[in-house]
């Protein structure tokens, strides 16, 4: 009897030790698994009844139809920048039925994020923006697959980051506030033939009725759009990029905020400083930009009838201006090789980006021509000026043939303005 009791005690002890060791082993494995998965940022879609999905999105189904909603569900959209504009884009795409998105942003929520971010709260301060969005959106749309990447997008890591899982995005949304990275991303999407839309500047804007979406070539009255457009033209991209922008000009009654001239100057400085955070902005405007982008994507991919982007195509106009320059070069007996340095692309750039489509002398925008500016300098972007044909004739005779000084022909104001444009071009070059 006693012997059996000891056997029972020994067996119980062995089982207890084995169970303890097993529990420790399982716990250790669990901790290792947690550590390994700590940095994984993919939210897998949970099972969600299709009837509930349809009920939740009943109004979208009524508006866009069965086929339109099917197309939206099939999209894989990459949003680069999860801050003041990007957070609204992500939220409304997921709320509207998109089932797969990737969010890319290296930054954390800060206290000033609460002014413009779509869903961040005080307790989110210090948390990665992508994690904040993923947690919030997973509660709204448990069917969604959200890939959150707390990394900076760069030219060097672009392919590995966007195509990390071997999947090709159907759309890229640019919400970056670093202008160099913004231009790099737009160039990347354009060259890889991925549909893209970009958010331009919300700074100094306050009129929601002036916000519109169009091709980059059609933007106006927005210094940030102009900076981006000009940099893209330098890379051979004049059209084919959709952007949301505001054509609102700063009200002169608010010159205490920023004068129109200073606005352009500060925008160019923002390019040099790489970020757009140096300009004053109204907290509601980023949301309007983000909602506009989300709406545009939803209607575009679903096939809902919408107005197509206009594209500025003035090749015939540029060709006629180029002809005036080539004829001048022939009259001056300039080396043909030198005069051929300017083609239609360069002429378009000079006309639209450097001189804003008008003569710096008279301000006229009709009967335009190009002329060599200084007789003793080589042909280059900083020695060619846009002016009217009549002004070209006078300039050619007095400056290029008779050898008069520029100061004898033009006012100090005109010369300073042209010199400023040339210095600006030197920066972009």
Swiss-Prot record:
In the record, biological process GO terms are: cyclic threonylcarbamoyladenosine biosynthetic process
The first-level EC class reads ligase
Q: Which UniProt keywords apply?
A: ATP-binding, Ligase, Membrane, Mitochondrion, Mitochondrion outer membrane, Nucleotide-binding, Phosphoprotein, Transmembrane, Transmembrane helix
Give the EC number: 6.1.-.-
Q: Which domain of life is it from?
A: Eukaryota
> Quick one: where is this thing mainly located?
mitochondrion
The annotated topology with respect to the bilayer is: Multi-pass membrane protein
CDD domains tied to this protein? YgdL_like (cd00755)
Transmembrane segments annotated in the record for this chain: 3-23, 74-94, 279-299
Subcellular compartments: Mitochondrion outer membrane
Q: Which Pfam families match?
A: ThiF (PF00899)
UniProt-recorded Gene Ontology molecular function terms: ATP binding; tRNA threonylcarbamoyladenosine dehydratase; ubiquitin-like modifier activating enzyme activity
Q: Give a yes or no for keyword Transmembrane helix in this entry.
A: yes
Q: Which InterPro entries match?
A: ThiF/MoeB/HesA, ThiF_NAD_FAD-bd, Ubiquitin-activating_enz
Q: What else is known?
A: Present with 8430 molecules/cell in log phase SD medium.
Name of the protein in its database record = tRNA threonylcarbamoyladenosine dehydratase 1
């Amino acid at each position: 009897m006693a012997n059996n009791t000891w056997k029972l005690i020994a067996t119980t002890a062995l089982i207890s030790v084995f169970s303890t060791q097993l529990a420790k082993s399982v716990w250790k494995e669990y901790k290792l698994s947690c550590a390994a998965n700590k940095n994984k940022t993919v939210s897998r879609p949970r099972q969600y009844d299709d009837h509930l999905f349809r009920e939740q999105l009943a109004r979208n189904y009524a508006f866009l139809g069965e086929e339109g909603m099917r197309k939206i569900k099939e999209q894989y959209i990459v949003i680069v920048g999860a801050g003041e504009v990007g957070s609204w884009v992500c939220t409304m795409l997921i709320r509207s039925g998109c089932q797969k998105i990737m969010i890319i942003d290296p930054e954390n929520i800060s206290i000033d994020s609460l002014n413009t971010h779509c869903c961040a709260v005080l307790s989110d301060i210090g948390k990665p923006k992508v994690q904040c969005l993923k947690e919030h959106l997973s509660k709204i749309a448990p069917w969604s697959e959200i890939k959150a990447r707390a990394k900076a997008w760069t030219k060097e890591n672009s392919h590995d980051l966007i195509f990390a899982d071997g999947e090709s995005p159907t759309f890229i949304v640019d919400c970056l506030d670093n202008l160099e990275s913004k231009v790099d991303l737009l160039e990347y999407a354009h060259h890889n033939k991925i549909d893209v839309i970009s958010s331009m500047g919300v700074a100094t804007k306050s009129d929601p009725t002036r916000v519109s979406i169009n091709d980059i070539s059609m933007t106006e009255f927005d210094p940030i759009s102009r900076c981006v457009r000009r940099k893209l033209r330098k890379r051979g991209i004049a059209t084919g990029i959709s952007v949301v922008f505001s054509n609102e000009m700063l009200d002169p009654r608010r010159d205490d905020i920023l004068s129109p001239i200073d606005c352009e100057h500060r925008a160019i400085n923002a390019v040099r400083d790489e970020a757009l955070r140096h300009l004053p902005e109204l907290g509601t405007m980023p949301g309007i930009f983000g909602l506009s982008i989300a709406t545009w994507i939803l209607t575009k991919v679903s096939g809902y009838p919408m107005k197509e982007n206009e594209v500025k195509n003035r090749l015939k106009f540029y060709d006629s201006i180029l002809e005036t320059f080539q004829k001048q070069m022939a009259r001056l007996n300039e080396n043909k090789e030198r005069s051929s340095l300017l083609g239609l692309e360069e002429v378009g750039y000079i006309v639209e980006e450097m001189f804003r489509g008008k003569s710096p002398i008279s301000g006229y925008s009709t009967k335009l021509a190009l002329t060599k500016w200084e007789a003793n300098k080589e042909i280059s972007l900083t020695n060619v000026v846009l002016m009217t044909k009549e002004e070209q004739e006078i300039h050619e005779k007095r400056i290029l043939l008779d050898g008069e000084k520029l100061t004898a022909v033009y006012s100090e104001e005109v010369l300073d303005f042209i010199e400023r444009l040339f210095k600006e071009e030197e920066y972009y070059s």
